[in-house]
């Protein structure tokens, strides 16, 4: 029953549908098609567009996948929670940058590792900058 239905669609209904389509002889003929003729062409154009997309999809660039889901990969992993406390009065310099991406080799001080991290993951993390106010 199912094969008979498929056979009928392919052998009878599809050729009849294609014969009724208002396909112009030239490319310029598409400009002279009426709205109702365009509406009759829409199913065919939709199927052709879908087949074209499915054909080129393997060649399209893949989306970047995030390399790792953990943020902190190596800093003080033996502690359940990493906390660094710095007394602001002890700041020697006027500007100090602290790491927020957990990739710094000089943690907790930023060594600009976030730049590479942002490129790899598409993230937008930056350092925490503390400025000493001079009165």
From Swiss-Prot:
Query: GO biological process: any one?
Result: autophagy of mitochondrion
Query: Which topology term describes how it sits in the membrane?
Result: Single-pass membrane protein
* Disulfide partners: none
Keyword terms? 2Fe-2S, Autophagy, Endoplasmic reticulum, Iron, Iron-sulfur, Membrane, Metal-binding, Mitochondrion, Mitochondrion outer membrane, Transmembrane, Transmembrane helix
What compartments host this protein?
Endoplasmic reticulum membrane; Mitochondrion outer membrane
Q: Which GO terms describe its molecular function?
A: 2 iron, 2 sulfur cluster binding; metal ion binding; protein homodimerization activity
Recorded GO cellular component terms are:
endoplasmic reticulum membrane; mitochondrial outer membrane
What the entry lists under InterPro entries is as follows: CISD1/2 (IPR045131), FeS-contain_CDGSH-typ (IPR018967), FeS-contain_mitoNEET_N (IPR019610), MitoNEET_CISD (IPR042216)
Which stretches are transmembrane?
A: 38-60
* Superkingdom classification of source: Eukaryota
Instruction: Please tell me where this protein is predominantly located.
Output: endoplasmic reticulum
Q: Which cofactor does it need?
A: [2Fe-2S] cluster
Per the record, ranges on the Lumenal side are: 1-37
Q: How is the cofactor bound?
A: Binds 1 [2Fe-2S] cluster.
> Which parts of the sequence bind [2Fe-2S] cluster?
99, 101, 110, 114
| KW Membrane (keyword) present | yes
- Which parts of the chain does the record assign to the membrane side Cytoplasmic? 61-135
**Record's PANTHER family?**
CDGSH IRON-SULFUR DOMAIN-CONTAINING PROTEIN 1 (PTHR13680), CDGSH IRON-SULFUR DOMAIN-CONTAINING PROTEIN 2 (PTHR13680:SF33)
Protein function: Regulator of autophagy that contributes to antagonize becn1-mediated cellular autophagy at the endoplasmic reticulum. Participates in the interaction of bcl2 with becn1 and is required for bcl2-mediated depression of endoplasmic reticulum Ca(2+) stores during autophagy.
Subunit details: Homodimer.
Q: Output this protein's name.
A: CDGSH iron-sulfur domain-containing protein 2A
Per the UniProt record, the source organism is Salmo salar
- Phylogenetic classification of the source organism: Eukaryota, Metazoa, Chordata, Craniata, Vertebrata
């Amino acid at each position: 029953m199912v094969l008979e239905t498929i056979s009928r669609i392919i052998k009878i209904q599809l050729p009849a549908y294609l014969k009724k389509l208002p396909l112009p002889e030239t490319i310029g003929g598409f400009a002279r098609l009426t709205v109702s003729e365009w509406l009759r062409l829409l199913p065919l154009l939709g199927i052709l567009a879908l087949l074209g997309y499915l054909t080129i999809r393997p060649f399209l660039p893949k989306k970047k996948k995030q390399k790792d889901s953990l943020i902190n990969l190596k800093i003080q992993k033996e502690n359940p929670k990493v906390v660094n406390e710095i007394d602001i009065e002890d700041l020697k310099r006027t500007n100090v940058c602290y790491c927020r991406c957990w990739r710094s080799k000089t943690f907790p001080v930023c060594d600009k590792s976030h730049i590479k991290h942002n490129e790899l993951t598409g993230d937008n993390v930056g350092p925490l900058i503390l400025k000493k106010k001079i009165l």
